[in-house]
């Protein structure tokens, strides 16, 4: 059984028994939703997602490109890898630095090349 997490995206095809999975576990999502590229998947069940955004500089009346890196939980049913374009959603604190969870892989690294 797959839960409705409140976002209009397809649930993963695989099933997992991770309690911190928003689709198959008991984790609720709320708040902000971001899109970014996975730059690291070294820690177990964790990915580092880098997102780029524009920030307005009032003095120069121009925009600059900035980036931020966010640590997110990577459930086994989604299994995001380095180079994948993913959608992450805010949730309760899962650890000292993890407050987001990967809810979908929008594009695999092989498809982007």
Swiss-Prot record:
InterPro entries: NA-bd_OB-fold, Ribosomal_uS17, Ribosomal_uS17_arc/euk, Ribosomal_uS17_archaeal, Ribosomal_uS17_CS
Domain of life: Archaea
GO molecular function, one term: rRNA binding
GO CC annotation terms, alphabetical: cytosolic small ribosomal subunit
SUPFAM superfamilies on file: Nucleic acid-binding proteins (SSF50249)
GO process terms (BP): translation
Keyword hit for rRNA-binding: yes
Signal peptide: none
Keywords, ordered alphabetically: Ribonucleoprotein, Ribosomal protein, RNA-binding, rRNA-binding
Listed PROSITE patterns: RIBOSOMAL_S17
Pfam families recorded: Ribosomal_S17
Keyword Nucleus: no
Xref: PANTHER family: 40S RIBOSOMAL PROTEIN S11 FAMILY MEMBER (PTHR10744), 40S RIBOSOMAL PROTEIN S11-RELATED (PTHR10744:SF9)
Role description: One of the primary rRNA binding proteins, it binds specifically to the 5'-end of 16S ribosomal RNA.
Family: Belongs to the universal ribosomal protein uS17 family.
Name of the molecule in the record: Small ribosomal subunit protein uS17
